[in-house]
């Protein structure tokens, strides 16, 4: 694997059926590769999750590549044009589960690291890898646990690239320099179950909650800013009733989510929701799940190096964006690290027939190399 091309390395990783939280030996293969380049490998196993912290160098600044070896399930394998866990070349594309999200990125960074270390064996600072098998799952025992371990022993990350598929139309056209925060509420509005013919003997929680839910849906939470759109509120699930047409439900269950900007905090949103629910005199319970604060890298050496490396490879500048979902960058940014996301085109991620353009992986490796060179070359 050490001397293989980026395509061959990607194939070897895709061929491992690492459906979350399984790693299926991907990190072991990476350890062997990195160990041969002088990295010290540390495997951290938490519950059902395998994590890797691999570092070359003892001094700062520390450049870290964060990624994951787990993939989402393939869905019905007979719906794929090629077997999802057998990497297959088709008309210039590499097909297989994880090709774009994110085994292609892992392969590109491994090749970039090999070329950089060979060219600059006495490079400045340290290069590190933070790899988990828990990114596509509940994200409890993965990156967040590794960060806790590093912080407990005062190991600091200065710059971090997350290899998530950030690109839209061609590799490098979009760099994620931040992400919105995420907060989920699970609301139970209580009523009194009864017969629909005798509403005076019951209390319909659907009717009780309608005005409050309407107010929540129409509320203006903030105006956003130069980097983030306004905070959004979306109801994702709603359920009441037994399935019978003649029974007034006793409870209404509502699940909703905020994707929020740096203009508000999770606590501000919780307080505003509570105020609205209380104003409508609802009998309710609510459980909050905080999925991560928003983060933003708007200036700094990492962003400069990334923009310069992409333009050197593509000949055109990249575009900065904070759109999209959450990533493990949300666990790394609070440590003070500069964090960006750069990876392949995301058009087929989590889909049947996931694939990545093979030429894009070669260009991505060149971009990663350029970033390392700009940050750590002597």
UniProtKB/Swiss-Prot annotation:
GO molecular function: acetylornithine deacetylase activity; cobalt ion binding; succinyl-diaminopimelate desuccinylase activity; zinc ion binding
Cofactor(s) this protein cannot do without: Zn(2+); Co(2+)
InterPro entries in UniProt: Bact_exopeptidase_dim_dom, DapE_proteobac, Peptidase_M20, Peptidase_M20_dimer, Peptidase_M20A
Gene3D superfamilies registered for this protein in UniProt: Zn peptidases (3.40.630.10)
Catalytic residues identified in the record: 70, 135 (proton acceptor)
Gene Ontology biological process terms from the UniProt entry: diaminopimelate biosynthetic process; L-arginine biosynthetic process; lysine biosynthetic process via diaminopimelate
Known pathway: Amino-acid biosynthesis; L-lysine biosynthesis via DAP pathway; LL-2,6-diaminopimelate from (S)-tetrahydrodipicolinate (succinylase route): step 3/3
EC class of the enzyme, as a word: hydrolase
UniProtKB keywords: Amino-acid biosynthesis, Cobalt, Diaminopimelate biosynthesis, Hydrolase, Lysine biosynthesis, Metal-binding, Zinc
Cofactor info, note text: Binds 2 Zn(2+) or Co(2+) ions per subunit.
EC numbers: 3.5.1.18
Keyword Ion transport included in the entry's annotation: no
Family: Belongs to the peptidase M20A family. DapE subfamily.
Described purpose of this protein according to its UniProt entry: Catalyzes the hydrolysis of N-succinyl-L,L-diaminopimelic acid (SDAP), forming succinate and LL-2,6-diaminopimelate (DAP), an intermediate involved in the bacterial biosynthesis of lysine and meso-diaminopimelic acid, an essential component of bacterial cell walls.
Name used for this protein in its record: Succinyl-diaminopimelate desuccinylase 2
UniProt organism field: Alteromonas mediterranea (strain DSM 17117 / CIP 110805 / LMG 28347 / Deep ecotype)
């Amino acid at each position: 694997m050490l001397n293989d091309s980026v395509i061959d390395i990607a194939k070897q990783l895709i061929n491992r059926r690492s459906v979350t939280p399984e790693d299926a030996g991907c990190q072991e293969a990476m350890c062997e590769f990195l160990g041969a380049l002088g990295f010290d490998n540390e495997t951290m196993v938490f519950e059902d999750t395998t994590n890797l912290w691999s570092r070359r160098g003892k001094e700062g600044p520390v450049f870290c590549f964060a990624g994951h070896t787990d993939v989402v399930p393939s869905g019905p394998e007979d719906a794929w044009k090629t077997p999802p866990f057998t990497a297959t070349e088709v008309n210039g594309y590499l097909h297989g589960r994880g090709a774009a999200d994110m085994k292609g990125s892992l392969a590109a960074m491994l090749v970039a690291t090999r070329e950089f270390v060979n060219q600059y064996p006495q490079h400045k600072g340290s290069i590190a890898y933070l790899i988990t098998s828990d990114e596509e799952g509940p994200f409890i025992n993965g990156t967040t646990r590794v960060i806790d371990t590093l912080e407990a022993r005062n190991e600091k990350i200065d710059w971090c690239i997350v290899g998530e598929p950030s690109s839209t139309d061609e590799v490098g056209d979009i760099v994620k320099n931040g992400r919105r925060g995420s907060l989920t509420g699970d609301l139970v509005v209580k009523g009194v179950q009864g017969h629909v013919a005798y509403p005076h003997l019951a209390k319909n929680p659907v009717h009780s909650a309608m005005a409050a839910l309407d107010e929540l849906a129409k509320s203006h939470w903030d105006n956003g800013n130069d980097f983030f759109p306004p905070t959004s509120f979306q109801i994702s699930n709603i359920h009441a009733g037994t399935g019978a047409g003649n029974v007034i439900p006793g409870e209404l269950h509502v699940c909703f989510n905020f994707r929020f900007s740096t203009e508000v905090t999770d606590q501000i949103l919780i307080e505003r929701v509570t105020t609205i629910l209380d104003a409508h005199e609802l009998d309710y319970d609510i459980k909050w799940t905080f999925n991560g604060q928003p983060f933003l890298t708007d200036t700094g050496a990492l962003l400069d190096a990334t923009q310069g490396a992409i333009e050197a490879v593509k000949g055109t500048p990249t575009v900065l964006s904070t759109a999209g979902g959450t990533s493990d960058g949300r666990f790394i940014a609070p440590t003070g690290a500069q964090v960006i996301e750069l990876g392949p085109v995301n058009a087929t991620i989590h889909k049947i027939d996931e694939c990545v353009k093979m030429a894009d992986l070669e260009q991505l490796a060149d971009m990663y190399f350029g970033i390392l060179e700009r940050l750590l070359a002597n």
